[in-house]
Amino acid sequence: MKVKFAKKYGFCFGVKRAIRIAERNQHATTFGPLIHNSREIERLQKDFDVSLSRSLEEAQKFKSVIVRTHGITKDDLQVLKEHHTHIIDATCPFVTKPQQIVEKMSQEGYQIIIFGDNSHPEVKGVASYGDDVAIIANIDELKHLTLKKKVALVSQTTKQPEHFGKIAALLVSLVNECRIFNTICSATFENQFAVDELSREADIMVIVGGKNSSNTKQLFKIAKEYCTDSYLIEDENEIDNTWFVGKELCGITAGASTPDWIISRVQEKIEQI
């Protein structure tokens, strides 16, 4: 089977930074999964004794706590500080940016609108820095909001720029004063553009990444638009040889939290089909 990779894929700057931080802080715990890739989380625990705490109470039992790439809520951060925990901040700088924007705009009296998934830890963290905050998943939800005169818009870092642009355009037409902040990560945009391009060419697409990863699911969604035979897998063990019957070119991309060692194993298995 012939394999072709997307021009941009895999580990982004924020994830690489977080992995380095975790590897330098053995015996610490992360408050929530450091990244959305269970295999890499297992590697960090096995090789560096970096454990995973899923609750604030659990994290407080450790002397050192690593803040996940997606960030945590303002209240949770304050609790850790008051507990005199050694806090190691691995929040992606691209996530810190909308946190700061939301806090500043709220202080200036703006209603905050976040384009994102309300259950995602990044969005929960960003929203915690504002007072009057509405979270919308799509443009239809915006149409049903009661809007104030002054509104500021930010986005979850992994959303599709095209959808954000449409929301921004509608919002401008609805309010007297609107501040728009494009907080979508540049790596997200580049990876999405690359998978869009490759999926138009490939007979089959394999997207490698955590199934709980927002950016990976976005890549899968885009690939599926142009290549109906698209599959989202976490590692090589999920590959089904029957997918490739009658196919000539397999396109591969990977989410921002997918390490190279997993991608290489996937490539090797597909090339042997």
Swiss-Prot record:
InterPro entries: LytB/IspH. CDD domains: lytB_ispH. One of its GO terms (molecular function) is metal ion binding. The keyword 4Fe-4S applies. Pathway: Isoprenoid biosynthesis; dimethylallyl diphosphate biosynthesis; dimethylallyl diphosphate from (2E)-4-hydroxy-3-methylbutenyl diphosphate: step 1/1; Isoprenoid biosynthesis; isopentenyl diphosphate biosynthesis via DXP pathway; isopentenyl diphosphate from 1-deoxy-D-xylulose 5-phosphate: step 6/6. Coiled coil: none annotated. The active site is at E122. Dimethylallyl diphosphate binds at H36, H70, H120, S213, S214, N215, S257. It catalyses: isopentenyl diphosphate + 2 oxidized [2Fe-2S]-[ferredoxin] + H2O = (2E)-4-hydroxy-3-methylbut-2-enyl diphosphate + 2 reduced [2Fe-2S]-[ferredoxin] + 2 H(+); dimethylallyl diphosphate + 2 oxidized [2Fe-2S]-[ferredoxin] + H2O = (2E)-4-hydroxy-3-methylbut-2-enyl diphosphate + 2 reduced [2Fe-2S]-[ferredoxin] + 2 H(+). It comes from the Bacteria. Belongs to the IspH family. This is 4-hydroxy-3-methylbut-2-enyl diphosphate reductase. The gene is ispH.
